[in-house]
Amino acid sequence: MTKKTLLFGCGSKWGLEFTKHLADSGYQINLVSSSSVDYPNVKTLNIDWVSSNETSVKELLVKEEYDLIFFNQNSGGGPGGDDFSPSRDYSVDHWNIHNWINCQLPYIVIKHLSSTITEKTKIGWMLTGLIVGNDTSRYQYAGYASIKSTNLHIMRGFSEFHKGIFFAINPIWFPIEDYKKDAEQISSIIERLESKDNGKSFMKDGVFWL
């Protein structure tokens, strides 16, 4: 039986390699992306992330039973760097846009598709090690880290109350020369996930993280 997946933000860079790997592995993919991807087994659902809203996202989604839903969209995030200095301000409007794209949109998606999610559906987020907060110099990525931290807790919240296997991945870093290897490795981690892994986060090599 063909597996179906719904991917967000996997239309370029490492994400595109991940999309191609899943497609080559037999997945039928609905790809929500600002990039148009012409590849076998991939249907692109084009989105303008910045102008998107709850209504447009719901209209875009195809309501069907997916084996995998994965959130890899990344608009960055602020404030950060010298946005904290007296001479600079960070736009609250931009701040809100980042929160919408990265945190609120996945929440809306899961709620909208709730009736199609089963105990075996895998729902994942791409995170970052910045959320741990041990390195005090990383305040320069404060907005980005806060978005990823929010997603960790959203993932855990759903794992407590919703059907499905909810998880997250810490990619550490994606060197261009390792795109293919990392795509294969993360795909392998996802394939092995079971109900006992619900609510957990893993490093990209499969080691338990948080």
Question: Over which residues does each language-model region extend?
Answer:
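Catalytic loop of short-chain dehydrogenase/reductase
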Residues: 75-79, 84-99, 107-108, 114, ...
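C-terminal helical subdomain
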Residues: 164-172, 176-210
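N-terminal Rossmann NAD(P)H-binding glycine-rich loop of SDR-like oxidoreductase domains
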Residues: 10-21
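Rossmann-fold cofactor-recognition segment
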Residues: 39-53
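Conserved hydrophobic beta-strands of the Rossmann-like cofactor-binding core
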Residues: 4-7, 69-74
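Residues in the short beta-alpha loop(s) of Rossmann-like NAD(P)-binding domains
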Residues: 11, 35, 129, 172
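Conserved glycine-rich Rossmann-like NAD(P)H-binding loop of the short-chain dehydrogenase/reductase
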Residues: 26-38
